[in-house]
A protein has these predicted regions:
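Active-site beta-strand/loop signature of hydrolases that rely on acidic residues for catalysis
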Residues: 3-7, 20-51, 99, 137, ...
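Structured beta-strand-rich core segments of catalytic domains in phosphoester-bond hydrolases
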Residues: 35-147, 249-252
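Short, flexible loop segments at the rims of nucleotide/cofactor-binding pockets, characterized by
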Residues: 5-10, 126, 164-169, 193
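Short, acidic/polar
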Residues: 11-21
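Charged helix-capping and loop-helix junction motifs
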Residues: 52-57, 165-174
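Metal-dependent phosphoester/phosphodiester hydrolase catalytic core
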Residues: 122, 131, 142-169
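Metal-dependent phosphoester-hydrolase catalytic domains
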Residues: 104, 177-189, 196-265
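Active-site environment of divalent metal-dependent phosphoester hydrolases
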Residues: 11-13, 36-39, 80-82, 157-161, ...
């Protein structure tokens, strides 16, 4: 069973992302920064006080069309205005998505906000302190005859950096509560995503209390598209390291400003 996680950057590098999605071999694909604009396809432009980025209007549908034998699950954290190529304004949903191969029965789904709560931004997207949702899916791995719970998370972005803060401590506690509620005794548990943390964050101590061990450590999880010096962002934690057959922080191909994380169990 292969689990793959990457911050998709709203599909900004869709020319590279699309063929990779089809070929990466994910049984469970966890994406962060996923977009959906009802009634619109193609390209939009996202703007906040710090950035202006091209994004796919409906990355959820774009990826789904390339994984027709996967079940899509989408948890929206917030929504706001984007512009189409004719400068028309549309409301775009933003969140995390998990695509599960049809060979894996989905036996449980749960989502929760780990920071804030759902917001509709009417006067533009804020640069920071946006709400964050996490999405947990519990599947049955038939060949291994076991249940696997996979939690997909996009952590709080703070303009001041990735250091621990009271908000990140609260986020870790909420995440731990979601993991506890979503899994059952004996489940292999995987938590993955763009956590926006430093490797020494107390979040890892809190999750270690649930038996979760980080596999990434201080590895570089950013690509050449990211120009800032701090190269830590994405992580993958597992409850049973002995079950891991393969783990990789994928340096190539580059499909985002984040490197993908892939694990075989």
């Amino acid at each position: 069973m292969r689990i793959v996680s990457v911050n998709a950057w709203g599909g900004a590098m869709f020319g590279e992302l699309a063929p990779w999605v089809e070929s990466c071999g994910a049984d469970v694909l966890c994406l962060q920064e996923v977009t959906r604009t009802p009634g619109l396809r193609g390209w939009t432009r996202f703007d906040d006080a710090e950035r202006s980025l091209p994004q796919r209007a409906d990355l959820l549908a774009d990826v789904g069309s390339r994984l027709p034998r996967h079940q899509p699950l989408f948890a929206v954290s917030d929504s706001g205005p984007v512009l189409d190529q004719e400068r028309g304004s549309h409301r775009q949903d933003f969140g995390v998505a998990t695509f599960v191969a049809e060979t894996l029965p989905v036996v449980g789904v749960r989502s929760a906000f780990v920071h804030g709560g759902y917001v509709e931004h009417h006067d533009g997207w804020p640069a920071g302190d946006r709400p964050r949702a996490a999405l947990a899916v519990r599947v049955y791995d038939r060949p291994a005859r076991r249940f696997v719970t996979v939690v997909n998370l996009h952590g709080l972005r703070d303009a001041s950096g990735k250091a621990d803060s009271p908000a990140r401590h609260a986020q870790a506690e909420r995440l731990a509560a979601l993991v506890t509620g979503a899994r059952e005794d004996g489940d292999l548990t995987v938590v993955c995503g763009d956590l926006n943390l430093l490797p020494d964050s107390e979040t890892f101590r809190i999750l270690a209390g649930l038996g979760l061990r980080d596999l990434v450590g201080d590895a570089d999880t950013r690509t050449s598209r990211y120009r800032r010096p701090v190269r830590h962002a994405s992580y993958l934690l597992v409850s049973d390291p002995a079950a891991v057959k393969e783990f990789e922080v994928v340096a190539a191909p580059e499909v985002s400003d984040h490197r993908a994380l892939t694990i075989a169990v």
